[in-house]
């Protein structure tokens, strides 16, 4: 079953990753790259992508008379989406284990980032009729 692993971060201090030392950023990305390679080798990897910061986000709603576009994530939101992974695994427990490894990737000084990761299964639906 496919799962999406949604990585979230706090809006406060959103630029903190850029303040990390190059050594810490390299170590963090090396762990995430290793996890991605391992998942690809096992056939469980589908996709991963980091996202631009909340200052670049737009919200679009299809409303009567047009599609208004507003800036940013919802103002009342304290967290924002950092990025995601999509995995195709046999059990929810396997998805949880992968999320735990991603969350434990090192941050400054080698300490785990403990980024919250929401794990959600893909909904099943019927294919549209031709």
Show where each model-derived region lies:
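Conserved, structured core segments of small domains
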Residues: 1-130
């Amino acid at each position: 079953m496919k799962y999406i692993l949604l990585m979230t971060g706090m809006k406060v201090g959103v630029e903190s990753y850029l303040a990390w030392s190059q050594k810490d950023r390299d170590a963090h990305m090396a762990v995430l790259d290793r996890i991605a390679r391992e998942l690809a080798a096992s056939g469980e990897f589908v996709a991963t992508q980091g996202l631009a910061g909340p200052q670049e986000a737009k919200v679009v709603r299809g409303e009567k008379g047009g599609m208004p576009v507003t800036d940013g994530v919802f103002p009342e939101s304290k967290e924002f989406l950092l990025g995601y992974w999509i995995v195709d695994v046999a059990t929810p427990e396997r998805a949880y284990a992968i999320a735990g490894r991603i969350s434990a990737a090192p941050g400054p000084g080698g300490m785990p980032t403990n980024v919250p990761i929401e794990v959600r299964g893909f909904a099943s639906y019927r294919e549209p009729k031709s």
